[in-house]
């Protein structure tokens, strides 16, 4: 019997020591003990800092006197419009460009703005839902659950389960729709968009006093809200709807946001910082640079600039991949850094050359992993997270990361990124780009590329794309958003997805579904003895025990034949250890993509092992069985799946795979049915399995 040992306390401590070191491990233990003691004080409501900023507090925050308050606010109003990277002087040219050359974008923007005016939102896969009037900011529209708005933020649990998704009210309260309304008002002159924007901000402030309710429970969302409020406010600041009285209320709320963030930075007990902490930093950077009249702004700005540089070094690997093992979070973090870099440049705040160098590499990574159809693979967790949505609100696929190139084009003068950005290149207009000065677009490179530090290996040529995932548990071994997807394959042929990563459906609202989607068995890889590549930690969602290491043994790219060989040792912890090696062979002349797996025992005992292969196909694929394989039928082509052929001890068999109905999550909160092929083998190792996909298939039989 093969035994997968349980995770003991010693295992956890050793993993922490390897991932973050002795100091951080001791720190984590002390902080957890302190939190248990401190929780008694919270339960007795003895510790309740107030973050409300009323009239006298706003006067003090601005370092002025009551009789001078309006003068200070008027000066801030005048200056705020020039404190974002957006150049108001270019507005006539931008408006003309949208009306004459980006008519589809303008139409989609106004259509989405109309939906918001009617309080219709699509929140994390809910589909268009009317939230009524007034909007209930404390309700999860998908489950109907409502959080008590009088509960202090620190007392709100984050994981109710039973279908209750705390991320839904958080997403709504991030305020992405406010920037949309302000843009629509700016480009169309529509008064109702400006009125709706100010009305929604007023309604939110009245329903969400600082520090109370679900929408203050996560500092990351507080920070993102601050950024979006500043964008909306700066774009509308010259309009009559922005009265001095209303403006003062918003500034008071933003001061509360800044103070809240400084006191509630999201640092893990082990000292590890990730995308949440970075979002906190970016929120403080925006507040510090755009609200310079606030007395604490200098402190916020100085802290944020230091932390921004430090987090680039901590979170972004040498080849440009973000360290949390998720493509979706790579996009979010890249957006945070790009937006911050543009803001710093606008305010003449110098950032180190190494910061810019690594940020440019983040964009190169996104260009590398983007498929020919403009969409990114769904590797690791994904919650549709964005810092701000300046193009494509409500109508662009959340897997489209090309807006990064629109901003990257402005920062790094990479001419080829205009073509890579597709319609999202106009993101750059909101960061200072001039439409008339844009050169003729050039084709983006389409060659194979490897990102060894992050573990993405991509074999691509024209309209064909294959990605082998070799990224280990990230976040310094914590694996916050990592899935058990080692050596899994994404395959895209002639404009269509064939093999796909199933993505991520839900987080805390359905822990069982979350674990299913991140399991080894959900991905196009091999499961040995029903074990996970990295063990799931009972009771903990956003982490994996770091059991696996990956080694790439061969990488040959660029010719008519390309080869990639890699292996992982995640199954060597088993009582009878096993190593999995996978070879990818691409023959471009014969248009064939072949996968060969070898599983070998790491000891001399002749013991039987249970091995299972999983291949999740894209939803548009249909599979039809044939004598020695399967036909893969899509709306635009027919491919041939040859095999599988399983060889062990001089004997080769052609096991009959079982066709299952699986699920693919194209975005958080939404699934599609998709075919899954599975086959199993049981016996004494070593065993080798080979299968291939080709355009040149057998005739129908």
Positions of predicted regions on the chain:
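Extended, charge-enriched "interface" segments that sit outside catalytic cores
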Residues: 31-160, 167-171
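Aromatic-lined, polymer-binding surfaces characteristic
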Residues: 146-150, 155-159, 165-363, 375, ...
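Residues that flank catalytic or metal-binding motifs in active/ligand-binding sites
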Residues: 173, 280, 362, 453-455, ...
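C-terminal substrate/ligand-recognition segments
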Residues: 175, 493, 595
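CBM-like, beta-strand-rich accessory domains located in the C-terminal region of large
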Residues: 223, 382-383, 389-394, 405, ...
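Carbohydrate-active enzyme catalytic cores, enriched for enzymes
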Residues: 321-499, 504, 553-557
């Amino acid at each position: 019997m093969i035994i997968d040992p349980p995770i003991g306390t010693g295992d956890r401590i050793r993993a922490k020591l390897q991932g973050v070191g002795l100091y951080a491990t001791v720190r984590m233990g002390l902080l957890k003990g302190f939190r248990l003691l401190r929780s008694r004080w919270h339960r007795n409501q003895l510790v309740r800092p107030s973050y409300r900023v009323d009239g006298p507090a706003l006067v003090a925050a601005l370092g002025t006197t009551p009789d001078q308050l309006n003068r200070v606010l008027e000066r801030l109003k005048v200056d705020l419009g020039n404190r974002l990277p957006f150049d108001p002087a270019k507005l006539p040219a931008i408006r003309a460009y949208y009306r004459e050359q980006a008519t589809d974008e303008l139409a989609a923007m106004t259509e989405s703005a109309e939906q918001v005016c009617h309080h219709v939102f699509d929140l994390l896969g809910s589909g268009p839902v009317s939230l009524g009037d007034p909007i209930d900011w404390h309700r999860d529209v998908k489950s109907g659950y409502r959080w008590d708005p009088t509960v202090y933020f620190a007392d709100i649990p984050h994981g109710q389960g039973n279908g209750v998704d705390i991320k839904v009210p958080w997403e709504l309260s991030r305020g992405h729709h406010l920037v949309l309304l302000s843009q629509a008002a700016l480009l169309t002159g529509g008064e109702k968009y400006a009125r709706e924007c100010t009305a929604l901000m007023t309604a939110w402030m009245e329903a969400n006093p600082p520090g109370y309710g679900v929408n203050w429970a996560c500092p990351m969302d507080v920070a993102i809200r601050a950024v979006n409020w500043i964008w909306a406010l700066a774009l509308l600041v010259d309009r009559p709807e922005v009265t001095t009285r209303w403006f003062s209320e918003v500034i008071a709320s933003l001061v509360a946001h800044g103070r809240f963030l400084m006191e509630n930075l999201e640092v893990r007990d082990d000292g590890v910082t990730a995308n949440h902490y970075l979002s906190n930093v970016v929120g403080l950077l925006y507040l510090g640079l755009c609200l310079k009249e606030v007395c604490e702004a200098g402190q916020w700005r100085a802290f944020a600039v230091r932390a921004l540089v430090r987090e680039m070094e901590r979170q972004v690997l040498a080849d440009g991949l973000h360290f949390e093992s998720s493509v979706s979070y790579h996009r979010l973090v890249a957006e945070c850094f790009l937006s911050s870099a543009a803001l710093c440049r606008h305010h003449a705040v110098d950032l180190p050359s190494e910061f810019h160098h690594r940020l440019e590499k983040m964009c190169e990574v996104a260009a590398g992993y983007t498929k020919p159809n403009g969409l990114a693979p769904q590797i690791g967790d994904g919650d549709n997270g964005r810092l701000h949505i300046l193009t494509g609100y409500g109508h662009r696929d959340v897997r489209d990361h090309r807006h990064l190139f629109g901003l990257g084009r402005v920062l790094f003068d990479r001419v080829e990124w205009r073509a890579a950005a597709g319609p999202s290149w106009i993101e750059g207009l909101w960061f200072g780009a001039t439409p008339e000065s844009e050169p003729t677009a050039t084709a983006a490179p389409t060659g194979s590329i490897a990102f060894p530090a992050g573990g993405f290996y991509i074999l691509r040529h024209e309209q064909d794309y294959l990605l082998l995932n070799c990224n280990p548990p990230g976040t310094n071994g914590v694996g916050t958003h990592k899935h058990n997807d080692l050596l899994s394959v994404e395959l895209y042929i002639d404009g269509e997805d064939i093999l796909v990563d199933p993505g991520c459906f839900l987080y805390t609202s359905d822990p069982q579904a979350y674990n299913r989607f991140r399991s080894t068995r959900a991905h196009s890889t091999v499961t040995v003895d029903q074990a996970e590549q990295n063990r799931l930690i009972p009771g903990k969602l956003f982490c994996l025990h770091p059991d696996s290491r990956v080694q790439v043994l061969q990488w040959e790219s660029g010719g008519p034949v390309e080869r990639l060989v890699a292996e992982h040792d995640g199954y060597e912890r088993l009582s009878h250890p096993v190593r999995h090696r996978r070879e990818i062979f691409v023959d471009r002349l014969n248009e064939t993509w072949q996968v060969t797996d070898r599983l070998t025992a790491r000891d001399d005992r002749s013991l039987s092992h249970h091995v299972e292969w999983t291949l999740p196909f894209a939803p548009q694929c249909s599979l039809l069985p044939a004598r020695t394989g399967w036909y893969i039928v899509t709306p635009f082509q027919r491919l041939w799946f040859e095999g599988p052929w399983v060889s062990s001890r001089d004997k080769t068999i052609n096991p009959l795979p079982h066709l299952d109905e699986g699920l693919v999550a194209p975005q958080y909160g939404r699934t599609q049915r998709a075919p899954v092929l599975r086959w199993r083998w049981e016996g004494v190792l070593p065993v080798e399995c080979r299968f291939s996909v080709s355009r040149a298939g057998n005739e129908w039989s």
